[in-house]
Design a protein with these regions (language model features):
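Conserved RecA-like ASCE P-loop NTPase motor core of nucleic-acid helicases/translocases
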Residues: 119-123
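Conserved Walker A/P-loop ATP-binding site and its immediately adjacent core
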Residues: 124-130
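Peripheral, non-AAA+ core regions of ATP-driven protein-machinery
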Residues: 3-6, 10-13, 17-79, 86-94, ...
Length: 452
C-alpha cells in the first residue's frame, strides 16, 4: 500500500514545520520564508537508530590518535581546516557558482591519492565524462580516484561502505535524494534528511565527507539553516569572478579556529596557493597618486596589506553620491560624518568613492584611519607616501582607538619594506623600536590628518 502524501510548510531558514502557511516563522522570526512541500505520511526521518546497544564512556577513556588528521597537501586549506582533515568529520563548502568549489576539492583529491588515501567523488550534477574532462583541464590524472554519478542516497551509501574510501566528496547536496521522503531534490526536507544520512555514515565509519553547497543570492547556503548546524565545519569560498583572488573562510569549525583564511588565485590550471597575500595584492600598485593608501586588515591571525583607494570630486546632484566596494558602506558614511564634524572638512558638496583594490572584502575596523587618509588625500590632492602603512579605528568623538595585533601588523609592514607606520597611540609597544619601521603615534583624527 502506497504511503499517503500531505502538504506541509517548512521555513527555509530554520526548518520549522507548520500545517499552514505563516507570514513570520515562529522559530527564527524570519518573514516570508515558508515554502510548501509534499511529504509521505509516516516518514519521520531517514536516519535509522543503531541496532546495537551503546553505553556511555568516561572522557579520560576516549583516545584521540595523532593520525586522526590527514594533510590535504594544500597548506592554505589545511590552515582553514585547523591542521588537516579529521576522520569522521562532515564539512560543508559553500560559494557562488563558478567560484572554484569543485576545483579545490578535485585538487585536494589528487593530493590525497598521492598519499595513498582512498577517495570517492560523487556527483549528482555532471556525468563521469564531464568530471574527467574538468579534472584533466586542471591536471588531475589519478587512476586510483573513484568517481560515481548518482543522486540516490541509498545507492551512494552502499557504494561508500563498500569502496573502503576514507574521504568522500558529495557534489552537490542540493541534487541528492532520499526516496522515502518523497519530495523533489533541493527542498528543505530533502537537504535536511540527506545531510542526516551523510552525518550518520561519517560518524559510524570514520569517513571524512565534504559536501558542496550552492548559495542563494543573499550569499547563504541554499536549504534550511539547520544544515549549517548539523555539519562539523562550514567553509565559504569568496571572491570576485572578475579578479583572480579567492578567499576560503571558515565560519564554523568544531576541530579548529574559525579565525583563519586561505588565499588562492585562479589560473588556467586551477587554483594556486598564495604564500604572500600582501605582496600579491600590492603588486602593480600606482605610485605618487592621491587617494591611494596601504592599510592592514587582520584576516584570522594573518595580517594582510591591501591598497585602499578613494576618489572625491564635486557632485552634480542635489545629494552627493557615496559608493564603497569591498568595505562596509555604512562604515564609510560614519567616517565621512566624523571628518565633517570633528575635522571641519566640507564634504557635503562632493561625491566620495571608496574601493579595496584586488577584489578583496575587508571588515576590519583597523582600516578606518586609512579610509580617512585616502579621502583627505583625494580631496586636497596630496599624496600619501607609498612606503607608509596606516592603522587605526575612528570613534565618533574623532579619537583614534586601539586595535588588535598591531605589533604583528607592523612586522608585516617591515617585512614588506615599508618605512613608516601610523598607529593609535594606545597601541604603542617598545618591541616596535626593534623594527626597521618608523612608528608615528596619533590619538585624534585631527592630529593624524595633520601628517598629510
Amino acid at each position: 500500500m502506497a504511503a499517503k502524501e500531505k502538504q506541509i510548510f517548512f521555513c527555509k531558514e530554520c526548518g520549522y514545520e507548520s500545517a499552514k502557511w505563516q507570514g513570520q516563522c515562529p522559530g527564527c522570526r524570519a518573514w516570508n520564508t515558508f515554502v510548501e512541500e509534499k511529504v509521505k505520511v509516516g516518514v519521520k526521518g531517514a536516519v535509522k537508530q543503531p541496532k546495537d546497544a551503546v553505553s556511555p564512556m568516561g572522557i579520560l577513556q576516549v583516545t584521540t590518535a595523532e593520525e586522526s588528521r590527514v594533510q590535504t597537501g594544500m597548506r592554505e586549506l589545511d590552515r582553514v581546516l585547523g591542521g588537516g582533515i579529521v576522520k569522521g568529520s562532515l564539512v560543508l563548502v559553500g560559494g557562488d557558482p563558478g567560484i572554484g568549489k569543485s576545483t579545490i576539492l578535485l585538487q585536494m583529491c589528487r593530493n590525497l591519492v598521492h598519499q595513498n588515501v582512498n577517495v570517492l567523488y560523487v556527483s549528482g550534477e555532471e556525468s563521469l565524462s564531464q568530471i574527467k574532462m574538468r579534472a584533466e583541464r586542471i591536471g588531475v590524472f589519478e587512476k586510483d580516484m573513484l568517481l560515481l554519478c548518482d543522486n540516490d542516497m541509498d545507492n551512494i551509501e552502499r557504494v561508500i561502505t563498500k569502496s573502503n574510501a576514507s574521504v568522500v566528496i558529495i557534489d552537490s547536496i542540493q541534487t541528492m535524494v532520499v526516496e522515502e521522503v518523497g519530495s523533489a531534490p533541493g527542498t528543505v526536507t530533502q537537504v535536511r534528511e540527506v545531510t542526516a544520512r551523510l552525518m550518520q555514515v561519517a560518524k559510524q565509519y570514520g569517513i571524512a565527507i565534504f559536501i558542496v553547497g550552492h548559495v542563494t543570492k543573499e550569499g547563504n547556503v541554499a536549504g534550511p539553516r539547520t544544515l549549517e548546524h548539523m555539519v562539523d565545519s562550514v567553509l565559504y569560498f569568496e571572491g570576485d569572478r572578475n579578479h583572480g583572488f579567492r578567499i576560503l573562510r571558515g565560519v564554523k569549525n568544531r576541530f579548529g579556529s574559525t579565525n583563519e583564511i586561505g588565499v588562492f588565485t585562479m589560473t588556467e590550471k586551477g587554483l594556486e596557493e598564495v604564500d604572500n597575500p600582501s605582496q600579491a595584492l600590492l603588486n602593480g600598485r600606482p605610485q605618487n597618486v592621491s587617494g591611494s593608501v596601504v592599510v592592514s586588515s587582520l584576516e584570522g591571525t594573518r595580517p594582510i596589506l591591501v591598497e585602499l583607494q578613494a576618489l572625491v570630486c564635486q557632485t552634480n546632484f542635489n545629494m552627493p553620491r557615496r559608493t564603497s566596494v569591498g568595505i562596509d558602506y555604512n562604515r564609510v558614511n560614519l567616517i565621512l560624518a566624523v571628518m565633517e564634524k570633528r575635522v571641519g572638512m566640507n564634504l557635503w558638496g562632493y561625491d566620495a568613492y571608496v574601493n579595496i583594490a584586488g577584489g578583496m572584502k575587508v571588515n576590519d575596523t583597523a582600516v578606518d584611519l586609512g579610509v580617512a587618509f585616502a579621502i583627505a588625500s583625494s580631496m586636497n590632492n596630496k599624496v600619501v607616501p607609498s612606503d607608509t602603512m596606516i592603522i587605526g579605528e575612528i570613534g565618533l568623538a574623532g579619537e583614534i582607538r586601539g586595535v588588535t595585533n598591531v605589533l604583528q601588523r607592523a612586522k608585516e609592514a617591515d617585512k614588506m619594506g615599508f618605512a613608516t607606520c601610523i598607529i593609535p597611540k594606545s597601541n604603542y609597544d617598545k618591541a616596535m623600536d626593534k623594527l626597521n619601521v618608523k612608528i608615528l603615534c596619533v590619538s585624534t583624527l585631527v592630529e593624524a590628518l595633520s601628517l598629510l
